[in-house]
Amino acid sequence: SGKGGIPAVIRVGSETTFPPFEFTEDDKYVGFDLDLADAIIKQMGSKMEFKSMGFDALIPAVQSGQIDMIAAGLDATPERAKQVAFSDVYFKDNGYCIVVRKDNTTINDWADLAGKNVGAQVGTYQVKLAQEAKAAEVKQLDSNSQAWMELQANTLDAVVIDQPVAM
């Protein structure tokens, strides 16, 4: 244990296909959320131990004690707030967007997702948005990287994602 009952090491979990917040660069985990978590933990006099995991595993990992905190673009929904404590909001994004291939001519807004095959990362609010848009199938993918590959392979018509990540 560290000073004042603060652990010497704080275990941080994240899903690392969410640039610019969490991603892999030159075989290292980097990004805004990780830098912020590391700075806060250093200020506390502790060291950060990082664990990469699936987005849908983050809350269960905190609940089971595998990690101490989450550093990720995790929307503070009422359902999630019943399971874990949230910090103050430190980044407010401009919402969600639809990503399509360049050759797309039929999807221009949310209503156009009806009857289409749409991808979204498992465990995210975007899954709910795609379902509400009455997509024929909402494919829940393990990572944003997988979503981009499926979109390029033409197995998805669109991907719903946070706007900063899509940019």
PLM regions: where:
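Alpha-to-beta junction loops
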Residues: 45-47, 63-72, 116-117, 136, ...
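Short Pro/Gly-enriched coil loops immediately N-terminal to beta-strands
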Residues: 84-97, 114
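A ligand-binding cleft/hinge motif common to bilobed small-molecule-binding domains
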Residues: 73-83, 129-132, 157-167
